[in-house]
């Protein structure tokens, strides 16, 4: 069975990708699966905040039909 997910990328994660996109994934997909698919790695551009439906979630959360996933990179400065 497949599920429909809205994926939102912010800041540097958009570079060469997209801002918002509707995607279809298989049931049981987690945010970590999406992070891996996009090639987002800790050594290049580490994940700062992961939100699903405007709530903080962990990378192993099992996504559900209609979820909205937002990925924000770590931000530094001072």
Where are these regions (language model features)?
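Ubiquitin-like/PB1-type beta-grasp interaction modules and other compact soluble beta-rich domains
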Residues: 1-77
